[in-house]
Amino acid sequence: MSDIKTYEYIWLDGYQPEPSMRSKIKATDEDSPPDWSFDGSSTQQAEGNSSDCLLLPVQTYDNPTFSDHLVMCQVHAADHTVHPSNTRAAAEALLSDEWWFGFEQEYFLTGKDGSPLGWEDGQPRPQGDYYCGVGADNVQGREISEAHLCLLYTSDAADDL
């Protein structure tokens, strides 16, 4: 049996005003994900003449689908300083002051044109009809939200799905 493990490294790119998620998979015999690098010029995080950026693992989760582990990363510059696109570092500094807050993930699925899926006029109806709804008139893209539920099977349970 092989001792090779796969780690899917996940990070936010440098696109503005809204960054996108990026990922790449590393196969290794190491028991925990090592630091890794990537070409920041392809993700709006570095100039082409000096494009190395570092991926520093923050948290690792068991992956219920493809690779062995999902590795949430923060980005640092090649000199190991916090990268400007790394908003996690600022949030971590703020949280060190013992603030309490929670996150609830609520989302709408949209088409490429930005309009919500499932509403003929492009605008959602009043919330009462589809809040916690079922059926084709009230729910679109259920397979995506069900895939989201796979988070329950990672090493840390999801909360408030």
Each language-model region and where it sits:
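Single conserved hydrophobic/aromatic residue that forms the stacking wall/gate
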Residues: 153-161
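ATP/Mg2+-dependent ligation/transfer catalytic cores
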Residues: 1-152
